[in-house]
């Protein structure tokens, strides 16, 4: 098992360092809560054959079209499971948020295609071999599998819905390792037990790039009229590499994956307050979506919150 995982994980990249130093650079009627998903989620630890009680990973989801949109172009995906043997327990989680663009039909189709194409690739290349009997070693590392999944999604959108585009933030948990594939301006955050909140992805927007270059301030970027214009999105332009980051799981704490309809409307302090006071990730997601709607709900809103074990 050790050799299997060593080959699979490949070279680790410290996501915390990269995110810290970017390049120069209960519910209202408008909220559509998604059912909570609860599954065994242990760290990759040794287990006693006589007493195996893995801790729980709890996942909550929430989504809304918002107050000013008559349709929803966001898509999400969530899968949580655990590989358990008589001596070890390895958690597996795959979570994705995609924010479509290109109009009602094209945007909705692009985001849906993206999550299905990415999920099917990861399940086929990683999940199925990992959980087969006997276990098979995938031919690629986690980073290579995630990169190939993004390319698969990109080409599928170009083929099936020309003119459509979407962001994609895909988070993969395997054992104690976190791998993120990212394109666009949806985001992944680490929320730690000390109350700190860290962005784990970089927005691929023109305004964010101007901020990285020092041409505008963070405050100016937040209200810039072109802040939602992207220079990188799935289904748009030639093939490109997604940003792939790998690190150890930031636990105990939470992972939040969300579209800009959430992070661009309510503040980080509001997000932290809601999560700290909520009784579960599902309730937290419903309350975050409701808060974004109460703030005007200018865009589609999607959130996935994963509570990590101690």
Predicted segment positions?
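PP2C/PPM-type serine/threonine phosphatase catalytic domain
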Residues: 1-310
